[in-house]
């Protein structure tokens, strides 16, 4: 029996107090949630402290909360901020645990089968288990997730029912406990004690839960009774303290008992027979042979080991679901009355909508050619309407909400005032004729004031030509193109802030992490060319890049005024008017945001130096030298992941793959 602690409130800790229009935004959001409003939008301008407002709302409504971001980097940033705001509550992180993932696929045109290949990040796997176990044990939980949270995860009921509950004085034999641990996919390993393992020393069993990374538990027996349970340091075995109740959740999210397993296998066999009959009737003998061989091997593994590679493809049978029925996901681990917050909703909701179709197209090919049973199609992400069915109450958070969010609710709460008093920038529209010389003059003014400039173009050629021109004119400039790796990108932004160069040119400067307070000018070339980067939403996002500096200014170079330009200019002017009135009424003098220029953490410096060296000469390395380089990078990748610098870890992974392909 799991004792769920449901009486612990969220406790927000911060040296800040709500300011600007944060108080009214917080009050409105809380009142609407408590009044039963299903959906609302927090329309927060760049730099207004949306995460702090979200934290205040969570602490006041006191509901388990799922925060969804559109990529791992943003999720990691939010996770770090929420951990600081709620040190006494359970703040969890749930993203895809793959450092590298090549999904199973088949290309009929070349008769190429691509086997699933992946590298699981142990640290993220631990955090995923920590998230699900926290949700089943307590209510004061915030889970920060990527869209990975809408993918199949296994039944929360089976996961909870399989948990092993232990207390001092409980009558249970040591061997019974060992059998129970094996049933929930723990492995016995008396030598290499790590997550998901247990070891036995006489009447003492030590267990390392899948949700922990440093602390394990020691269960001491006296005959067929538990004498004592202690929390211990996994490395030294040193006792930290005694515990009066220990719940051990399964070491995998896909778990089932023996009786249920046999029922599942019977269903798999029945589906196999049906599909084989179909293939044979169509004369697809190769596909039939392939499917029989693969599926019978998986069935044997399930019988003997309780697990097989690709077990998730049989999740419909394991969960007892009907064909087409949505899979269990992280959302099913939450209680009914939970709150969802969608960060950067204009991006995230588009991702949620698009996940299902791409997944189905790939899997249908595997089914058609005998690599998987049709039930594999039900191991999938949720459709958007299925996601909506899980929504009890939701807050969409964005500076530029999308059409979908606007169609879901008329309740829009604005957060326009920045705590620093900063205004949205002034905007000029200038003709494209003579734009190079005009822009050069503007850049020189900024250089004289030790300020920086962003320039955004629409094409790679324009960016390259402009970079060459400015260099000829003596401007210190860099072009950030799509081929630049994330690690280099971080270094480029840092160098821009330090004044190593003064102008950064790019095609898409909307990506996260491009907020630079030193930037006082944003120049938008071809502003009148309608499209993704020049629609109203894209323009407002780009304009926001100049909103961190008191002298922020935007120049749009265009030969005509498009509807998108006009709407973006009008919206910026409206916000600016509100901000000026507020500052005047409260005697606030705008100040440029003070943001430390952090030295890259030691691992980043080391890794970057290593990468630069290897990028210069790894082609001339011997195979042995390359192997040493790969080993060093793998270690650094793990260290980066442990520091939750998953962006850096991903770059390490990509370089490792490049090096491996050379041998």
UniProtKB/Swiss-Prot annotation:
Which keywords appear in this protein's UniProt record, sorted alphabetically? Answer: ATP-binding, Cytoplasm, DNA damage, DNA excision, DNA repair, Excision nuclease, Helicase, Hydrolase, Nucleotide-binding, SOS response
* Any one Gene Ontology BP term: nucleotide-excision repair
Q: What is this protein called?
A: UvrABC system protein B
What does the record give as the function of this protein?
The UvrABC repair system catalyzes the recognition and processing of DNA lesions. A damage recognition complex composed of 2 UvrA and 2 UvrB subunits scans DNA for abnormalities. Upon binding of the UvrA(2)B(2) complex to a putative damaged site, the DNA wraps around one UvrB monomer. DNA wrap is dependent on ATP binding by UvrB and probably causes local melting of the DNA helix, facilitating insertion of UvrB beta-hairpin between the DNA strands. Then UvrB probes one DNA strand for the presence of a lesion.
Query: Which Gene3D superfamilies does UniProt cross-reference here?
Result: P-loop containing nucleotide triphosphate hydrolases, UVR domain
| Basic and acidic residues bias spans | 1-10
Quaternary structure and interacting proteins, as annotated: Forms a heterotetramer with UvrA during the search for lesions. Interacts with UvrC in an incision complex.
Q: Where does ATP bind?
A: 44-51
Please give the Gene Ontology molecular function terms for this protein: ATP binding; ATP hydrolysis activity; DNA binding; excinuclease ABC activity; helicase activity
| Superkingdom to which the source organism belongs | Bacteria
What family is this protein classified in? Belongs to the UvrB family.
UniProt xrefs under Pfam families: Helicase_C, ResIII, UVR, UvrB, UvrB_inter
Pinpoint the Helicase C-terminal domain residues. Answer: 435-601
Region annotation (Disordered) maps to 1-23
Q: Which SUPFAM superfamilies match?
A: C-terminal UvrC-binding domain of UvrB, P-loop containing nucleoside triphosphate hydrolases
Instruction: Give the organism the record lists.
Output: Streptococcus pyogenes serotype M12 (strain MGAS2096)
All copies of domain Helicase ATP-binding, residue ranges: 31-271
- Placement of sequence motif Beta-hairpin: 97-120
Q: What is known of its domains?
A: The beta-hairpin motif is involved in DNA binding.
List, alphabetically, the InterPro entries matched: Helicase/UvrB_N, Helicase_ATP-bd, Helicase_C-like, P-loop_NTPase, UVR_dom, UVR_dom_sf, UvrB, UvrB_inter
Please give the GO cellular component terms listed in this UniProt entry.
cytoplasm; excinuclease repair complex
Principal subcellular localization: cytoplasm
Ranges of residues in domain UVR: 627-662
């Amino acid at each position: 029996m799991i004792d769920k602690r449901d009486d612990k409130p969220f406790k927000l800790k911060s040296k800040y107090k709500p300011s600007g229009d944060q108080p009214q935004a917080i009050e409105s959001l809380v009142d609407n949630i408590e009044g039963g409003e299903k959906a609302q939008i927090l329309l927060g301008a760049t730099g207004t402290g949306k995460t702090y407002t979200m934290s205040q709302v969570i602490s006041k409504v006191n509901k388990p909360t799922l925060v969804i971001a559109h990529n791992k980097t943003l999720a990691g940033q939010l996770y770090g901020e929420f951990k600081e705001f709620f040190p006494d509550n359970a703040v969890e992180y749930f993203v895809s645990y793959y450092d590298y993932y090549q999904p199973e696929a088949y290309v009929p045109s070349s008769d190429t089968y691509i086997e699933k290949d992946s590298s699981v990040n142990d640290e993220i796997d631990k955090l995923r288990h920590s998230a699900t176990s926290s949700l089943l044990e307590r209510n004061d939980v915030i889970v920060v997730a990527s869209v990975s949270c809408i993918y199949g995860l296994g039944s929360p009921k089976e996961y909870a029912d399989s948990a092993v509950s232990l207390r001092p004085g409980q009558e249970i034999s040591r061997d019974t406990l060992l059998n129970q641990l094996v049933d929930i996919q723990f492995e016995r390993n008396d030598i290499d004690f790590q997550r998901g393992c247990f070891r036995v020393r006489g009447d003492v069993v030590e267990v390392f839960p899948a949700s922990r990374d440093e602390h394990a538990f020691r269960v001491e027996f006296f005959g067929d009774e538990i004498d004592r349970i202690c929390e211990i340091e996994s490395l030294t075995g040193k006792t930290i303290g005694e515990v009066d109740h220990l719940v051990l959740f399964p070491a995998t999210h896909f778990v089932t008992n023996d009786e249920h397993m046999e029922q599942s296998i019977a269903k798999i066999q029945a589906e196999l027979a049906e599909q084989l009959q179909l293939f044979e009737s169509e004369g697809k003998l190769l596909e039939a042979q392939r499917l029989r061989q693969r599926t019978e091997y998986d069935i044997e593994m399930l019988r003997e080991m309780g697990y097989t590679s690709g077990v998730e493809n049989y999740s419909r049978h394991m969960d007892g679901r009907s064909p087409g029925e949505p899979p269990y996901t992280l959302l099913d681990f939450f209680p009914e009355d939970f709150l969802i917050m969608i960060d950067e909703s204009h991006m995230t909701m588009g991702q949620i909508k698009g996940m299902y179709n791409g997944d189905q197209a790939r899997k249908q090919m595997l089914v058609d050619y005998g690599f998987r049973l049709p039930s594999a199609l039900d191991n999938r992400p949720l459709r958007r309407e299925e996601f909506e069915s899980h929504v009890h109450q939701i807050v969409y958070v964005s500076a530029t909400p999308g059409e979908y969010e606007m169609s879901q609710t008329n309740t829009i709460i604005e957060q326009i005032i920045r705590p620093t008093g900063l205004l949205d920038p002034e905007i000029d529209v200038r003709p494209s004729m003579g734009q190079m010389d005009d822009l050069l003059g503007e850049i020189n003014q900024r250089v004289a004031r030790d300020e920086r400039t962003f320039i955004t173009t629409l094409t790679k050629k324009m960016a390259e030509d402009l970079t060459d021109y400015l260099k000829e004119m003596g401007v210190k400039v860099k072009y950030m193109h799509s081929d630049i790796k994330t690690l280099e990108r971080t270094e480029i932004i840092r160098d821009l802030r330090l004044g190593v160069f003064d102008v950064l040119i790019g095609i898409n400067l909307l990506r996260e992490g491009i907020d630079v307070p030193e930037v006082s000018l944003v120049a938008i070339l071809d502003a009148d060319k309608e499209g993704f980067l020049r629609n109203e939403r894209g323009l407002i996002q780009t304009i926001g890049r100049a909103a961190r500096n008191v002298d922020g200014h935007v120049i749009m170079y265009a030969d005509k005024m498009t509807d998108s330009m006009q709407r973006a200019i009008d919206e910026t002017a409206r916000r600016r008017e509100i901000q000026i009135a507020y500052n005047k009424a409260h005697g606030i003098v705008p100040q440029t945001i003070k943001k430390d220029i952090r030295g890259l953490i030691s691992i980043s410096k080391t890794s970057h130096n290593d990468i630069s060296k290897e990028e210069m000469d790894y082609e001339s390395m011997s195979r042995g030298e390359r192997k040493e380089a790969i080993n060093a990078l793998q270690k650094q990748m793990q260290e980066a992941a442990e520091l939750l610098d998953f962006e850096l870890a991903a770059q390490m992974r990509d370089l490792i793959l490049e090096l491996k392909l050379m041998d």
